[in-house]
Every structure is written in C-alpha cells, then in structure tokens.
Amino acid sequence: MEAIAKHQFARVSAQKGRLVADQIRGLPVEKALDILAYSPKAAAGLIKKVLESAIANAEHNEGADIDELKVSRVFLDEGPTMKRIKPRAKGRADRIFKRTSHITVVVSDS
C-alpha cells in the first residue's frame, strides 16, 4: 500500500531541497518528522508539510497504521524558473533566477 503527496511549484531550488530529501529517504515517518522539525534548512519545512499530507492520505484513503509507515520514496524535480532583472551600475542588468521545484513524497507500509 502506497500513499502519495505532492507540492508543485515550491519556491525552493531542487538542488537545495534534495539535500534535505536525502536525509529522510527510507526512514520510518516518526523519525523523518523529527529530523525535518529540527533541520535549519528552509526546504525542510516544505518537505515536512508534504510528508504530513502523505501520512494523512495513507491513514484516510488506505486505512494504514501510521506506526508502520516508512518514507519509501522522496524526490524533488525541477520546476519552472522565474527570471527577474536586477539593475546594476552604468545601465547594465543582472539576471536573477528564482527557481522552483516539485516535491513528491511516497509513504508505504512495506
């Protein structure tokens, strides 16, 4: 039994989010939530909300026991990039890339 939760267009770069995702992959959900709660990374808060949603989906839709759930898969795919301009001296301009990502968390009881 698997339950999936997604957060699309999250305002965190996929590269930074994957650092957090790698820490919780394969762990029981209780331990994963503890790690995310005390992580200083901004992506940890976003991934924690998606994980809590996946747990709720497993409990409500599948009738799963929360104590047996594990994070079977967690991955961040690159989303669209918002391009902005920052004015600089002498009429020049720098490009600012505001990167987004799609967070997917899959929990299972096996």
From Swiss-Prot:
SUPFAM superfamilies in UniProt: Ribosomal protein L22 (SSF54843)
GO annotation, cellular component aspect: cytosolic large ribosomal subunit
GO term, biological process aspect, one: translation
Keyword RNA-binding in record: yes
UniProt entry keywords in alphabetical sequence: Ribonucleoprotein, Ribosomal protein, RNA-binding, rRNA-binding
Signal peptide location: none
CDD domains: Ribosomal_L22
GO molecular function: rRNA binding; structural constituent of ribosome
InterPro entries: Ribosomal_uL22, Ribosomal_uL22_bac/chlpt-type, Ribosomal_uL22_bac/org-type, Ribosomal_uL22_CS, Ribosomal_uL22_sf
Domain of life the protein comes from: Bacteria
Gene3D superfamilies reported for this sequence: Ribosomal protein L22/L17
Assembly information from the UniProt record: Part of the 50S ribosomal subunit.
Entry similarity comment: Belongs to the universal ribosomal protein uL22 family.
General function of this protein: This protein binds specifically to 23S rRNA; its binding is stimulated by other ribosomal proteins, e.g. L4, L17, and L20. It is important during the early stages of 50S assembly. It makes multiple contacts with different domains of the 23S rRNA in the assembled 50S subunit and ribosome. The globular domain of the protein is located near the polypeptide exit tunnel on the outside of the subunit, while an extended beta-hairpin is found that lines the wall of the exit tunnel in the center of the 70S ribosome.
Matching HAMAP family: Ribosomal_uL22_B (MF_01331_B)
Protein name as catalogued: Large ribosomal subunit protein uL22
Species in which this protein is naturally found: Idiomarina loihiensis (strain ATCC BAA-735 / DSM 15497 / L2-TR)
Underlying gene: rplV
